[in-house]
Amino acid sequence: KNWRNGKERGPVPTAGELERALFQLAPRDLAESWDNVGLLVGDCGREIHRALIALDVTAGTAAEAKEAGAELLVAHHPVMNCNWSPVQTLRDDSQQGRLLLQLVRDGTAAICMHTNLDAAQGGVNDALARRLGLEQTAVLEGGGGIVRMGLLPEEMPLPAFLALVRERLRPNGIRFADGGRPVRRVAVGGGACGEYFAAAAAAGC
């Protein structure tokens, strides 16, 4: 039954089915080799009636999912990454252990879509480019398949571009270096992306 109005609806998807559906949007093979994506916690066969979407899986978002009656938490950043911090024990005297145990005890599955969603067509960086109003967008050569490049509708001085970024993206803060020239060609990359600065500069961004 539909939880809103009690009317009949189609079959309820399982966590495993939702993982496969999300991988159709952001294929697993687009993820960086060090990344950890997909259904990271939970029962593949668990029926999912309600899901909560968050940037991170934290104690707070896990508690919010439980309170909302959501059986699934879909997040961008991986709840665990064996390349960064291998999980060797599952104990309640570590922050990560407490979080994973909280998810298991609450019956909350966790699907994480990270660099594969950054790189996917229509994913994070395409969304950033659209939000900034970039035109003629393309994947930046040398940008790891993640970074997007495009043109502003018109050239603008750096202060005006910074104001546009503040208005459209509402960041907590902005770090910038004044190159002494107006802005037209822009590269966007969610996350660090520092290793792609040289490629962006070479492309005229």
Each model region followed by its residue ranges:
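Hydrophobic structural segments
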Residues: 1-205
